Each structure stands twice: as structure tokens, then as C-alpha cells.
Amino acid sequence: MYPRGVKRSHHDYHRQTAFRTIKRSTHRQTSKFISHFAKNFRGKLAPLKQLDESRLDALSLTELEQLKTIIEEKQQEKRAQNNAITFLPNLPTVPFADTNFSLKSLGLRPYNGDARDPKQRIRDRFPQTHERICLLTNDILETDLLLRYRQCLDSLTREENQQLMGDRIFSLTNSPCLAFTVATVEEACSYFKFHDLHNLPVNPQDLFMYTITVMKFEFFNKLNMAKLTCVFNDNGHGDIEYRKLRQLCGKPVLDREMPNSELEVQQQTPDSFRHPIQQAMSIVVTFARILRQIKEQIIQTKKPQFIRDFDTGRVAERYECGLMSRLIGKQFSNHKCDDVSCQNRIERIMAPWKPSLFFCTYFAKDAPKFKLFPNFPEEYRNLSFTCPKVDTEPSCSYSTNHDLPQTSHRSHKNHGTPKVKSKVCVEKPDTSILTTTKTTTEILIEESMETDNKIPNPRELNFNQAKQEEIVIININENVNSKHESESSVEMDLDLDYEADTCETNLNACSSDSE
């Protein structure tokens, strides 16, 4: 052993006491790692920078504008070069950017339908109102629509692609219902089918390809909200079939020993499973496994890879557009049981946009900041999630004794029964007149902010309590008089019917399928 910082000399082997001291320095860079530019031009960087600044000061405005256009062109060239580099490591060029294919070589025809241009759709992220997004199978597989989507996705920069994938993953993880998740999975599977049908090279960093694994887990999470042990119990052994689904998705099964391992279940073909939900999940798992193998092969070979070389079971070839929706709908529509909670769960996960917000505290001027205007279906577009701007006090079903007409007391005396009010008139706010003065809503906000800072007066509290006691509740009767029906088209019937089973709040209390 030698002292710290001392090493035996290799030049004088005959001398036992020949040592040399090693200078330990971790801050100084080794000479072999210094580039040629740093060796020769390290001391000349400052003069070059000053020289460039002096040249820029001598340029005129016209020359500066020309220089600006040249810089923008160079930036576009740099972006194109950076776009040619894949996100996968150790790949100098993109092996899947094959630009040699054309419509004639692929056997496609130009799309002339009502769907918008793919560039606009990718830019807007979501469809506009009354926009056509439901396409036929021939329009998806036999036209150049998906090919244009592929070309648009390949032309995105790395930052734009990451932003687009982040938005898609966020929408998947926050899906409102199973119907939206199934539609998203169907979209990715159709895109996968298009690449297999026309033998296109796969881009692993594609928007639809990259998020297949996320779709698999979110698809299972939405299905798991149903009582799958009851759904799979149509042919018996519901618990075992549910555990097979967990193995298929890669979820742990620890409470029971299964005959097959997780890897063996995932390598089975969709036809080997009994239930349609298992077959749909097997298709997604197979596509995710094929894409993972393609990624590994691209890193090793640095060559374009195709789905046909990895799809040994020909799952993509036998897949049809709309198959996922048919399998899920077939499973839930054919399920019949006496369990009320099971039926309620199926109805809730399949029916989107069920209203769950009954009043809102947002004011109309604050609504655009939060973007509270999503694209709802037509039957739910009449729902308002913001408070309208009303300058006058609207009519309501509650009124004080002073506001009631005097004839109402006579009617009680003559007929002996209270007057029935069957409808409520909804006054529409007049938004045609725009003034710079403060609205009633803004004045009320300022007054409420002023009163919050004051100490409450006991006399005012007693007066408000006495004023609230004067409120009279008008009874609402279901019988509607034909005379009042033709008074106004703006009137709205009050429907007080409700279902008894909607009072159920704890859905996962008695289920064994929740994680």
C-alpha cells in the first residue's frame, strides 16, 4: 500500500523507493477533452464579438431587415434538421420518415368529404360546433386523410409534438366517461390499422402510437368502474374472468393463484378469450406490445420498421374500424342481472355529459378566463354554467306579502283553495344595449365587499330575519291549465319527477373489483 496521493513509479522498477507524487485536481479539464476550437480560439472570442457588434452598428435599416430574413431562413433550416432527429437515443436520422410514398403507390384516393384539414384540427385540438368527425370506414382506410395526419405530425417540431402529446394524455386521464375513452382507443386502433394495411413505416413518437400504452391503462380504469365480476358472471366464474382481465392489463393479482402467468395471458390472441371486453383489451395490449418491439428494433438497427414484421397473430389485419365500440356495447347491452347497483354503474359509465352542476358562483365577466364553454351535445347545449348578466330583477317563484296582488286574498276567500302557479317565466337578459356604466352585478359585488369589512349591526340582523319570515312559498301543482300554456313560448315547465335509485352515492362500497 502507498500513501494517499503517491503512486509507484513505472520507470524505475529496480529502485524500491522510487515514488512520484500525483497532483489531484478535479476542476481542471483534461487536455484530451478540450476541443480544437477551444485550443485555438479561446482568447479570440471577445474581439470577434466586439467586431460583430461594430459591424451591426454600421448597418442601415434596410440591411438589418435583410439580415433578419436571412436569420429566419437559417432558423427554419435548423428546425428542419432538428426535426429530422428522433427522440429516441443514438439515432442520428429518422428511420421512419419515408417520403417516397404517394397516393398512387399506396392506392389511395383524395379525400373530398366535409372533415376539416388535418393542420387546422391539430392546431385547434378539439372539433368546432357542428363539425363532422364521424367518418366512414372507406373514408378512413381508402383516402389520404390519415396520410395527411401522418405528414402533419411528422412535420411538427419536438416542442410542438410534446405539447400535443401532453394535451392528449391529459384528456385521456381526465376522460368524462367510458364512451369518450372507447372513441379515443378506436381512433388509435384505426390509425394502427391504416399503417398495417398500406405497409407504412411506424413512427414510435407519433401522437397516436406514443399514447397507446396510456390508453391501455385508462381503458381498464374506466371499465373497472363497472361491476365486472357481475358482468363476467353470465357464463359463470366471474371472479376468475375478472382476474384474467387484470393479468391482461398488467395489474397485480395477489389474492388467488391463476393457472397462467401474466406473460402467457398477454401473448394470447383475442379470439382465445371468452368475453368481448377481454377481446377488446387484448387488441389494445397486442398493439402496445408490437409498438414496444418496434421501438427496440429501431434503436438497434436504425432502419424503418413495419407492423407486419411483428404482428405474428395478424391482429391488425383482422381488426375492423368500430370493432371496439361493438365489443363493449355487446358486453354491456347483453348483460342482464337483478343487481340494481350493477345496472346503475353501467348506465353511468356509458352515458356521457350527465349534469352534475346545478348552480355556479362564477360571474359572466370571469367565465372566459376559465374557458367554461366546452362543446356539449345538442341535447345539453341549453345548460348554462355561468350566471347571466341581468340588469333587472328576474321573476322567481318566491315573493313577499307586499309584492303579492290584492286579488290573491279574494281568491282564497271565494274558492277556499290557494292559487296555483304551474309555470315560471324566464326573462331573457337584454344584451343588445352596451353601456360603460356599471351593471347591477358589479354594484352588488362592490357593496358585498364593503359590507364584508363592516361589523354587523344587531338591528340589521333582526330586520333581515323578520324580512325573511315574510316570504311566502307558492305551491306548485302538476296539473297545467290549457289557458296558461298559450300565454308565452318562453315559459318553462317545472318537472319534479326523480328516480329513487339516483340517491345512491357510494358505488364501490360492496364491490370487490375496485383497486
Swiss-Prot record:
GO terms for molecular function: zinc ion binding. Residues 398-422 are annotated as: Disordered. Disulfide bonds: none annotated. Residues 398-408 have a biased composition (Polar residues). InterPro entries: ICP27-like. One of its GO terms (biological process) is regulation of DNA-templated transcription. A zinc finger (CHC2-type) spans 230-342. GO terms for cellular component: host cell cytoplasm; host cell nucleus; viral tegument. It is found in: Virion tegument; Virion; Host nucleus; Host cytoplasm. Keywords: Host cytoplasm, Host nucleus, Metal-binding, Transcription, Transcription regulation, Virion, Virion tegument, Zinc, Zinc-finger. Zn(2+) binds at C230, H335, C337, C342. Its main location: virion. Residues 409-422 have a biased composition (Basic residues). It holds the Pfam family Herpes_UL69. Immediate early (EI) protein that plays many roles during productive infection including regulation of viral gene expression and nuclear export of intronless viral RNAs. Belongs to the HHV-1 ICP27 protein family. This is mRNA export factor ICP27 homolog. It comes from Human herpesvirus 6A (strain Uganda-1102) (HHV-6 variant A).
